Amino acid sequence: MSATKEAVAAKESITAKMARWAAAVDFSHLSQDAVFQAKRFLLDSIGCALGGYQQHDVKIALQVLDEVAGRGPATVIGTGKKIDPVSASLANALMIRCMDYNDIYWKQDPSHPSDIFPAALACCERAKSDGRELIVGLVLGHEFEMRFCEAAFPGIRERGWHHATLTAFVSPFVAGRALHLSWEQIQHAVGISASRHCTLGAVTAGKLTMMKNTVDPMATQSGVLAALMAERGYTGPEQVIDGKEGLTHCFGPEWK
């Protein structure tokens, strides 16, 4: 690498580095074990969704989406319906999440990485991709979400924020990759989603309501919307993680 390229790489934002990696990763790069585990999480997520489909909060959400969702290529699990990717990602993520049975990863912050899988599903269907791309999306969601969970001590939950805040950073990487966006477009998608979706920890404090298991699906939905906007040329802050008044600036020097 030349001195010029090294200087550029040193100045490159964390968002740009992650976006480059998301855009470049290929199914052939994944180990056999990673693919096997991704398939396990995929099957587990579908099982959770089929159980979630029966729940009252999901039925309410589906009624609302029946009224407002547009036509599209994205499947709503358990219904046989095809709607727009933004609405489908919310419906499917809520089904997976609502019973609290899906996977969990807990380090400095907790998360349920499979909540992000519906972003990959909806966008892969829109892009008419095969199952390999779906597996890539699932792996990306888990890899990035879990890394964010280890980013600082204390985590954002200890500071009064909900981990859906982190999902709003991760889901546009997944959605953007599934839509085959350039790394620059993915970077903008992250800026669009993350800059407007910070979730208060109040949803898990005191009396629990339906929103406890809805905020993360909404963050997943945010990433899909952001990726679709970036695909058309919409821009967002490029240094939303490590720039001025970005994530690390706002949460303090403990963030890595």
Model features per residue range: what roles?
Residues 2-256:
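N-terminal core-entry segment
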